């Protein structure tokens, strides 16, 4: 987070696969680059992210942050000439309301990254359900205490 400058641009509705219902992501279309799932109209925060490091591989990213889940269903990556280079779509699956608290967050199910310069796409699929570790409040406090995180400096 500190390696970037963050700028809020606007709020916008986008089409995204926010709650995948199938076991694994499926794709179709020319070169299998389109998700074959139910799209939803999602309210998002549009945020520009620029690296403070000059040698970073890309100039900037536009993140569409879902207002309800805080996941990033779409990310646009621009090269150093400020031309759109890559489009990343992240797919999540939301649990039913009857689940345990540790399973109540949306889980990553896959991602498609389209490289517009190379004219190819990378499809990554989760083959098994995402595991959510269960910790008691006392364990969380011990593991993430500031004194524990800075130990050894």
Q: How does the language model describe each region?
A:
Residues 1-42, 138-153:
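Flexible, processing/modification-adjacent segments and terminal tails
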Residues 1, 40-137:
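Gly/Pro-enriched, hydrophobic low-complexity segments
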